[in-house]
Amino acid sequence: MSDNSKENLRQIKSYVQRAGRVTKKQQQALDDYASKYMIEYDQNKSLDFSEIFKNSNDVVLEIGFGMGGSLVQMALENPTKNYLGIEVHKAGVGNILYEIEHQNISNLLVMSHDAVEILENMISDNSLSGMQIYFPDPWHKKKHNKRRLVNQSNVDLFAKKLKVGGVFHYASDWLPYAEEVLELLENDNKYKNLYDGFAPRPEWRPLTKFEKRGQNLDHPISDILFEKI
């Protein structure tokens, strides 16, 4: 892929910023807790994870945590890992801020900005022990495929930010998208598949709302786990 093609892909957003309904509880959480648990986007500042988490534990980045239920569960079940979640929709951000505060979660922080810009400008190379993208928008119409978050340009970007040995975990209920991601990663010499093809569903990955919806529609659930080499 040419540099110009990669740049064009970067400029196409993988999401649509909808107004959406924000409940009173979510708005209250945004007002009360954003200063405690949210990191503002600053294109001129690289994050120092040991400073913001106040420890040197491994950091896992999740892009698009939705309402945040599965990410909250993972943070609670893995207290020796730090989690940074990115979500652009206010309702989900408000929801997760409420949970962080009321469940006293100390290893989870949140950002609300374009994930690619955060990765490019605020995440140091070779700094993440894991990246996870669960049930991203499949943009299933062919004319919208270019909006998909996991594309060749971003796969290269993810590899830059992962440590050697860091794991990229993708899950989807839209098989054509999952097959496309699997092919991208299989053909990239910066990654090694931890399984032969698709991975079995990990017991430690919490069930998400979108996964349940996919199951109700009889969509196959695909997990992909690749290690940076």
Curated annotation (Swiss-Prot):
Annotated spans, Interaction with RNA: 143-148
Family annotation (PROSITE patterns): SAM_MT_TRMB
UniProt cross-references to Pfam families, sorted A to Z: Methyltransf_4 (PF02390)
MF-aspect GO terms: tRNA (guanine(46)-N7)-methyltransferase activity
Record-listed E.C. numbers: 2.1.1.33
Active-site residues, Swiss-Prot/TrEMBL: D137
Pathway note: tRNA modification; N(7)-methylguanine-tRNA biosynthesis
Binding site for substrate: K141, D173, T208, K209, F210, E211
SUPFAM superfamilies per UniProt: S-adenosyl-L-methionine-dependent methyltransferases (SSF53335)
A Gene Ontology cellular-component term: tRNA methyltransferase complex
Keywords annotated in UniProt: Methyltransferase, S-adenosyl-L-methionine, Transferase, tRNA processing
Catalysis performed (reactions): guanosine(46) in tRNA + S-adenosyl-L-methionine = N(7)-methylguanosine(46) in tRNA + S-adenosyl-L-homocysteine
Residues that hold S-adenosyl-L-methionine according to the record: E62, E87, D114, D137
Domain of life: Bacteria
Alphabetized InterPro entries for the sequence: SAM-dependent_MTases_sf (IPR029063), tRNA_(Gua-N-7)_MeTrfase_Trmb (IPR003358), tRNA_methyltr_TrmB_bact (IPR055361)
Protein family per UniProt: Belongs to the class I-like SAM-binding methyltransferase superfamily. TrmB family.
HAMAP family linked to this entry: tRNA_methyltr_TrmB (MF_01057)
Known role: Catalyzes the formation of N(7)-methylguanine at position 46 (m7G46) in tRNA.
Protein name: tRNA (guanine-N(7)-)-methyltransferase
Organism the protein comes from: Francisella philomiragia subsp. philomiragia (strain ATCC 25017 / CCUG 19701 / FSC 153 / O#319-036)
Lineage of the organism: Bacteria, Pseudomonadati, Pseudomonadota, Gammaproteobacteria, Thiotrichales
